[in-house]
Structure formats: structure tokens, C-alpha cells
């Protein structure tokens, strides 16, 4: 074995478009080499990108997939009737809640920032997430 891990990302436009379908795929394959890329912005379907659905959406995903996360993505989604992704900190994803859930399931890996296409957006998103991580870590500033 090469030690490689294949990451599957739940996304409304993918075949694996719900946490339930992802769980079914993981269970059917039964391989420790198949894991989840957790991107909370991707969990929202058309008509569901609204603040009132955020926590229940994240809770469901972590209940089904939390023990199988290989990588976290830091992307956001704007409140919209459709799907409108944006840089972390500019949308409705509850990042403190996301980070709490990552900690709860023992995730200690990296978070990849993406979905930032404008000048300075990555820097702004990185600063936003550093602040959320510091808050979650009792005020210590992460690297």
C-alpha cells in the first residue's frame, strides 16, 4: 500500500451530493483509504443557503462523516436562493461552529482556503480564519 488517501467532497453538483450519500459510499467501499474533504459551503443545496439552516446542515454532516475527515476546506457561501460561493468570512457559514465540530471529532489536519478570486481575498480570509482559530484556542494566535 502506498499510504494514499482519496478524498471525496460532498457538493450539490457532484454525484456524492449529500452527507448521507457520502456516508453510504464510505460504508460500501469499506476502505480506510477513502475519506472526506469537509467543505461546509458545499453542503448547501439550492434554496437552503440561509442562516436558519446553517447549524443543522453542519451538524448533520459531522454526525455522518466527522470520523472520516481527511481535509477541511475554508470556503463560504452567501445567503441566496441559489449557490453563490465566496471567500471565508463573507457568507453564512458559521466558522466558529465548524471549528468546534472539527475539534470535537479530533481533526488536527490542515484547512485549505479557496473560493477567493479577487485581489486580497485570500489574505482577508486567512486573517478571518486566524482570528476564529485564536478564539477557539483561548486567544492563542495560530501560525
Regions found by a protein language model. Give the residues of each.
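Short acidic/histidine-rich active-site segments
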Residues: 75, 108-115
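H/E-rich (His + Asp/Glu) clusters that bind or coordinate divalent metals
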Residues: 91, 96-105, 109-111
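Alpha-helical elements of Rossmann-like donor-binding domains used by nucleotide-donor carbohydrate transfer enzymes
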Residues: 21-24, 60, 97, 124-128
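Glycine-/small-residue-rich active-site loops that bind phosphorylated ligands and cofactors
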Residues: 13-14, 117-120
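Acidic/histidine-rich catalytic cores of soluble enzymes
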Residues: 1-92
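Conserved hydrophobic residues forming the short capping helix/wall of the S-adenosyl-L-methionine
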Residues: 26-29, 102, 133-137
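Short, flexible loop/turn segments with low-complexity composition
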Residues: 114-115, 139-143
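C-terminal helical cap(s) of enzyme catalytic domains, especially alpha/beta-barrels
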Residues: 120-139
